[in-house]
Amino acid sequence: NLFRGQGERDHALEVVEGHWPMDVEGSVFVVGPDKRAPEGHWFAEAGLLEKIRLVPDRRGRISVQHRIIDTPVQRLKRRLGFLFRRIVFMELSPFGVTNLANTNVQSIEGRMFVGYDAGRPIEVDPETLRFLTPVGSNAEWLQAAPGVFEPLCAVAAHPASDFEERALYFVNYTQISPPGVPKETWLARWPLDGPVRRWRVE
């Protein structure tokens, strides 16, 4: 394991050589697993979202924030951790398959979404980095395994943004299926509001 998580913390970075460019603005966002020990699968931890502000503060420092993507199931885990079990890179509980939200950050129309290959996309607030809501209801996605709150919904973590249509396109597929049952692949479109629409492809 080449990476090490650090949990929720903030930094103020100093420019130690040269000059920070004055013609940049906005922020850079990075997400990855908050993995703090070398054992186990690299993807098997909750997503830690990092925000690097490109405009220095009054003292010329670069602000860096880290926040755990605190989904409802992550909050349940803090209270009822004994109900959760890790199997390779998945986490299972009576609530379903935990959406670890740790693989990709996608922005469109001033909104930000985090992807994970075994869960619905999640919207987060780009200013506070706090969890807002999953994209679509569970019923709108193809489910590979049941779950009360989070069924296993295999949704490719890297959607395609269509800025003209103001929409996100996803691949939603079956990761596992019973013997004799063919796996399915669907193209999904979400217009940033309302229901997710899907079309089966072969």
PLM region spans:
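Beta-propeller domains
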Residues: 1-202
